[in-house]
């Protein structure tokens, strides 16, 4: 699956959240740029930002915090041995296509709730 700049994606750990946590957009991100080359190694990266703030359960993420992850890891499948109860197939999956960056002040006004997922066969 390929994403575009500004797409909203969810991390597979979204499935582990309570309904209340899901309302806070935890584990939802917006892709800012890819591919981006690491200046030292030449490795291709995805640059993305958090659409939530969370400082509990071993998480320390600020709203709008920027992350970089190698493309190969970003597009990798979920390790079903380590996470046997996860139904999502890939580490990140598309929620919504967007045409521009969502600014932090707009996040609470956007409907970012993922649609209900059909069970994988």
Language-model segment annotations:
Residues 5, 27, 44, 88:
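Residues that flank catalytic or metal-binding motifs in active/ligand-binding sites
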Residues 6, 28-30, 68:
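Conserved beta-strand residues within beta-sheet cores
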Residues 18-36:
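Short beta-strand-centered aromatic/proline hotspots
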Residues 33-38, 52, 75:
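A generic structural motif
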Residues 37-43, 81-85:
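Short acidic, Gly/Pro-enriched loop/turn segments at secondary-structure junctions
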């Amino acid at each position: 699956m390929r994403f575009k700049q500004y797409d909203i994606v969810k991390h597979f750990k979204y499935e582990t959240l309570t309904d209340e946590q899901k309302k806070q957009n935890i584990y939802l991100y917006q892709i800012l740029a890819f591919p981006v080359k690491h200046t030292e190694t030449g490795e291709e990266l995805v640059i993305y930002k958090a659409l939530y703030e969370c400082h509990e359960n071993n998480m320390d993420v600020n709203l709008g915090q920027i992350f970089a992850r190698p493309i190969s890891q970003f597009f990798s499948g979920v390790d079903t041995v380590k996470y046997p109860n996860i139904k999502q197939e890939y580490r990140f999956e598309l929620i919504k296509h967007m045409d521009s960056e969502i600014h932090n002040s707009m996040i609470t006004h956007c409907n970012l709730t993922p649609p209900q997922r059909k069970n994988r066969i």
